[in-house]
């Protein structure tokens, strides 16, 4: 099935049920190591999954880190409900402090170790007061409003 068929099938399903569809918009982390960041969009709500960075390649002189393009997210901040962190590797949490310098993240959910690591990074960057961190346990259900 090609992309046009998928879009057509999604549009038909949406028209039949009159309910929104889930849109998944990767901002980084595809065909590369690093920048793992993904937007999940459902109706009027947006959730960000991870906020990673990548390290520069050898030819990128003077560059310390490489960040995903968050233009789409920044254009839709009024719909942004929060972030879910999957784990504490740099390619999944390393960009969050940088993001917090540019825009507000209402709440960040994640496992205890990742949240502890993230809290330290945020304090070091001076952005710890710009969001709320919520630790979640395995199989815990969280409703993001």
Predicted regions and their residues:
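Short Gly/Pro-enriched turn/cap motifs at secondary-structure boundaries
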Residues: 28-30
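Conserved beta-strand segments of alpha/beta enzyme cores
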Residues: 23, 107, 132-134
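Short beta-strand scaffold segments in enzyme catalytic cores
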Residues: 35-40, 142
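N-terminal Rossmann-fold NAD(P) dinucleotide-binding loop
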Residues: 92
């Amino acid at each position: 099935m090609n992309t046009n068929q998928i879009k057509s099938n999604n549009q038909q399903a949406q028209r039949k049920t009159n309910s929104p569809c889930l849109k998944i918009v990767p901002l980084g982390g595809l065909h590369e190591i690093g920048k793992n960041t993904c937007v999940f969009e459902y109706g009027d709500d947006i959730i960000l999954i991870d906020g990673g960075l990548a390290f520069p390649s050898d030819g990128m002189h003077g560059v310390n880190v490489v960040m995903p393009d968050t233009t789409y997210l920044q254009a839709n901040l009024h719909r942004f409900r929060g972030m879910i962190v999957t784990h504490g590797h740099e390619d999944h949490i390393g960009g969050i402090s940088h993001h917090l310098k540019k825009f507000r993240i209402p709440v960040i959910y994640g496992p205890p170790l990742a949240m502890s690591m993230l809290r330290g990074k945020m304090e070091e960057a001076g952005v710890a007061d710009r969001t709320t961190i919520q630790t979640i346990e395995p199989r815990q259900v969280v409703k993001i409003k």
